[in-house]
Amino acid sequence: MRTPYDFDPGCTRRASVFTWLAMASVVTTVNLAYAGENFTVSSADFSDGGKIGSRQIFNDAGCKGPNQSPSLTWRNAPATTRSFAITIFDRDAPARGWWHWAVANIPASVKSLPENASASGALRKLGAIEARNDFNIDGYGGPCPPPGNPHRYVITVYALNVDTLPLAQGRPAALFDREISGSTLGSAQITVTYGR
């Protein structure tokens, strides 16, 4: 009759394998959380792959929208995140594309922005800075593509490894993008469309 005290080399090997697998699972879970593998962004104003909300449309150049920056919520950023940045880029605009928004120096404690955070002053209260977009205005400039084919707008939230980037309010969005790229731990994206 076997007892719990009987020695079975095969049993020991199996126990070791199970222990190793359990430890590997824990390490993998911790590493995923550390790297922000499940980092996501969403908006109450639209869904990924859908059309951008009517309140986000630009108010000039033939477009007649309220030009309000979208509400955004992000989750599961890398554990070592020290600040966040956000960009909105039209990848279908001619030549090099079109920057609609770039924001940096959002504190790591912030996990969402309300709608119209750009114009309302909410970002300034957080200590964040905004770039000059390709409409040549500081802050958010909504979609307003030429009539014809809809354009795709990529909204990206970046987790950064620095508290602040060496940038000033009103610098070009492309410069923001370059500085953001050099300090990124992870990013989350959604893409929306708009046409007229």
Regions found by a protein language model. Give the residues of each.
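Solvent-exposed aromatic/hydrophobic patches embedded in short alpha-helical segments
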Residues: 16-18, 155
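Aromatic (phenylalanine/tyrosine) cluster motif
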Residues: 5-7, 18, 34
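N-terminal secretory signal peptides that target proteins for export/translocation
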Residues: 1-13
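N-terminus-centered regions that define maturation/targeting leaders and the start
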Residues: 33-196
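Bacterial N-terminal signal peptides
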Residues: 19-29
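N-terminal twin-arginine translocation
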Residues: 11-12, 31-33
